[in-house]
């Protein structure tokens, strides 16, 4: 017999009910988040807070597991993983990203920013939005700017107190811009993965490295390199990113939830960072670490002139560099 209108409506209702039953209520999507830092580090703690925020604001539909200590691969590999959609969320310094987004290199220029407050004045505004657009075009969506801290030199075999004390030293570097910086200081750059620095110190294949104080402490580098030359030569950001592959699948409300959680995690990270710097300096002093502050940065700044000239002549970095220098 032919279906009556009433029977047709009943069939439609049953079909809808069956469809609802076949998709479990509150279905979860599990995501992976990566960083290079250890457990308890400000970055890791801020990312865990981000994960909890996302879980709460999406009613548990997105479960994010944070993998610290680069357990899913080193930084260059992780960049390619998130770019290819194999990784969902990650936090990077500018060095590993510079190969795919050359314009971010300017953010690692020596003596560009006075301190973190000066840096975030730009990144929390129009300049940060400009970089976010460049990163999105390369496959990354910015969720928040983290504090990469102020970097200084630390040495095992030398006790530097002036520019000339670094001449001839084997210094670990992480990227091209740091290689150029070290060469301009008449020292020898030694490219090494972050995880290999401690062993290199122990073997004597490097004299010095450079990083921020919390990283110096958390890695145990202070155990073999007890002489810190506080130059604060680079104040640079790190960034929390989500892959465009994931972003394209998110609804507008879920995108808003991720963005708000990212902003909150960035503010938390900066707060945790400032506390960690103070704690690390105090702890290192008790471990016999010697801190020598640079008396005059002008000799260092003058040495960097060729580096600034190079980036001023590069179309991908000129505009951002001019924006920052004009307002220093």
Regions found by a protein language model. Name each.
Residues 23-27:
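Sec/Tat signal peptide C-region and signal peptidase I cleavage site
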Residues 9-22:
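Bacterial N-terminal signal peptides
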Residues 28-118, 126-127, 133-328:
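N-terminal secretory/targeting leader peptides
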Residues 1-8:
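N-terminal secretory signal peptides that target proteins for export/translocation
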């Amino acid at each position: 017999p032919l279906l009556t209108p009433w029977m047709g409506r009943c069939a439609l209702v049953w079909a809808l009910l069956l469809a609802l039953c076949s998709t479990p209520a509150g279905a979860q999507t599990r995501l992976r988040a990566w960083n290079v830092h250890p457990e308890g580090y400000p970055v890791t703690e801020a990312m865990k807070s981000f994960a909890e925020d996302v879980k709460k604001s999406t009613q548990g539909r997105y479960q994010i597991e944070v993998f610290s200590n680069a357990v899913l691969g080193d930084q260059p590999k992780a960049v390619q993983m998130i770019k290819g959609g194999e990784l969902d969320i990650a936090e990077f310094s500018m060095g590993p990203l510079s190969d795919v987004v050359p314009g971010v290199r300017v953010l690692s220029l020596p003596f560009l920013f006075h301190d973190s407050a000066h840096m975030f004045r730009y990144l929390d505004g129009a300049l940060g939005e400009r970089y976010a657009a460049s990163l999105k075009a390369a496959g990354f969506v910015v969720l928040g700017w983290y504090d990469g801290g102020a970097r200084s030199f630390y040495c095992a075999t030398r006790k530097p107190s002036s520019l000339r004390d670094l001449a001839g030293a084997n210094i670990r570097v992480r990227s091209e811009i740091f290689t150029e910086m070290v060469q301009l200081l008449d020292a020898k750059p030694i490219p090494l993965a972050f995880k290999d620095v401690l062993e290199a110190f122990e073997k004597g294949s490097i004299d010095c490295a450079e990083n921020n104080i919390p990283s110096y402490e958390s890695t145990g580098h202070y155990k073999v390199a007890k002489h810190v030359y506080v130059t604060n030569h680079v104040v640079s950001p790190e960034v929390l990113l989500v892959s465009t592959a994931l972003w394209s699948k998110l609804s507008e409300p879920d995108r808003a939830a991720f963005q708000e959680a990212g902003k909150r995690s960035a503010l938390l990270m900066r707060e945790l960072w400032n506390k960690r710097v103070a704690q690390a300096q105090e702890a290192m002093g008790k471990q016999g670490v010697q801190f020598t502050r640079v008396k005059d940065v002008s000799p260092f700044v003058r040495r960097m002139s060729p580096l600034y000239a190079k980036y001023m002549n590069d179309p991908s970095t000129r505009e951002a560099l001019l924006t920052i220098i004009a307002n220093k």
